[in-house]
Amino acid sequence: MPINRSDIRRGVLESLLAIAPEVDTQALDDARLLRDQVDLDSMDWLNVLLGLHRRFGIDIPETDYARLATLQQIVDYVAERAR
């Protein structure tokens, strides 16, 4: 059974909060660049992606990183690949 988008979004936010607990997830705009809204360095970003890998069982190749700029893009990406 596919995972619904609200569950994916919740999982993405939980992965983000594990790295940056100070983030106000209620204030995030799904369409804005995530890095403009959250102070993440490159190592933090890799840890968020690792959290997504662990949570959803998906591999995220480095060539796809540019496709994951907004919260909506991340949710869409995970929805396409999650099992």
Question: What positions do the PLM features span?
Answer:
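Two-component histidine kinase catalytic core, primarily the HATPase_c
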Residues: 44
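Phosphopantetheine carrier-protein modules
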Residues: 19-39, 55-67
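Thiotemplate assembly-line natural product biosynthesis machinery
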Residues: 2-25, 81-82
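C-terminal structural segments of small proteins and small subunits
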Residues: 66, 72-81
